[in-house]
């Protein structure tokens, strides 16, 4: 029986369309996971070519032949022109703590600043609490207190300590949904503040998704300032993290000093049980072997330098190192003189903020795990002009295009950060 050539061609086209649709759905799903939190047209230069970003879609322009995108420095903060210069009053105090790592700290700082600003209260610098009882640090152990106070001086009064005459025991604890709005503060928090005089704020996370929504309206410029213009590492921690970035670039001389950061942590992978989502080629998270195959099929060379957020080397990572020998965890690239303080501490806060710093500044970021670390790292990368975020997937073919796996946060410009940068 003869074969109709038109039917064969039509069949091939149909299969191709389903594969493309599966990849698109996967990337959207990875960004839209609604997880519960712990405890409560511009041009982007490619290597030797360009990628055009139009109407939220990313595609290669003729002549594209590289995997490394150049930084995009076109975006600038919108909030300086939108902030009011009204004097900061001081009717009482707002206290809070930073918990669960830097990806949560950003949101917790933002919520506390918003509450203090719209209540006309004085904000007290937070302490930093780890996952274990009694695991506490001063804010200044990790972050630059003077930078935060200076950045907020015309918005919110910030003090380093609560006056002795004010007791924490008498403060009302107010749970605040992350991305809290002025309207919510007026309706739910202001009455408590007026009654008690001082409050303690605790953020909770109904979702770890940071997509901007049409229902959100304009992002409050105070929130933009707090999220992207106030929180920096203190000088010593910053210097250690930057030295590690430079060491990774030294290992990457053949690729112009470029390297990939992969958020891959064995303990989290074991807890999440990386199950399939029902969408072709998509999962909730990816192990070392799957990340290695993903990067190899995209065409990254075997001498590509890769940084992993995994705290210490684990035998399950060997497959990744077999394919990409220049794969490192932090103990291999941290200066020897700093390891006792930053790697042998009971608390993991130093390691967490270093991971966030390196992941935000790498030439490519690959989130093996969907969650708030991914979402806030993308936000920081947008602020720094580093849009190279590749969402992993199981590539059924022998190879794939990196531009097919750009995070929708970037390709569709639907991350909250795009409301804060023009």
Swiss-Prot record:
Gene3D superfamilies per record: 3.40.50.11350
CDD domains in alphabetical order: O-FucT_plant
Disruption phenotype: Decreased of mannosyl levels due to a reduction of glucomannan content.
Annotated TM spans: 7-26
EC code: 2.4.1.-
Gene Ontology MF: a single term: mannan synthase activity
Pfam families registered for this protein in UniProt: O-FucT
Expression sites by tissue: Widely expressed.
Annotated substrate binding sites: 263-265
Compartment(s) where it occurs, according to its Swiss-Prot or TrEMBL record: Golgi apparatus membrane
UniProt keyword terms in alphabetical order: Carbohydrate metabolism, Cell wall biogenesis/degradation, Fucose metabolism, Glycosyltransferase, Golgi apparatus, Membrane, Signal-anchor, Transferase, Transmembrane, Transmembrane helix
Pathway entry: Glycan biosynthesis
Presence of the UniProt keyword Glycosyltransferase in the record: yes
Residue intervals on the Lumenal side: 27-422
Membrane topology per record: Single-pass type II membrane protein
Ranges in the topological domain labelled Cytoplasmic: 1-6
Biological process according to GO: cell wall pectin biosynthetic process; fucose metabolic process; mannan metabolic process; mannosylation
Functional summary from the UniProt entry: Glycosyltransferase involved in mannan biosynthesis.
Similarity annotation: Belongs to the glycosyltransferase GT106 family.
Protein name: Protein MANNAN SYNTHESIS-RELATED 1
Organism classification: Eukaryota, Viridiplantae, Streptophyta, Embryophyta, Tracheophyta
